[in-house]
Amino acid sequence: MVSPGYMSFELVATSEKDWKDAVIEAYNAAKKSVYGIRSIQILERDVKVKEDLDKLIYRVRVRVNFQIAEK
């Protein structure tokens, strides 16, 4: 019996609320494309400042790890 395989990909997500919300946005985007998500690793985070709009944009770069379906 072969143990299940795993794959990963990276993506960037944003939120005007906070980093937690940005991670939730990343999860919501990822689950539209893959299933069997096992973990989300935060690789980088920063805040983009939009002074002209008096706004902060929270950004996260994450790695999404998911299980490959067995046939």
Annotate each language-model stretch with its function.
Residues 6, 37, 55-61:
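Short connector loops at helix/strand junctions that flank enzyme active sites
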Residues 2-40:
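Short, well-ordered alpha-helical segments
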Residues 43-47:
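Generic short beta-strand segments
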Residues 48-55:
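Acidic pyrophosphate-coordinating catalytic loop
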Residues 57-71:
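C-terminal edge-of-domain segments
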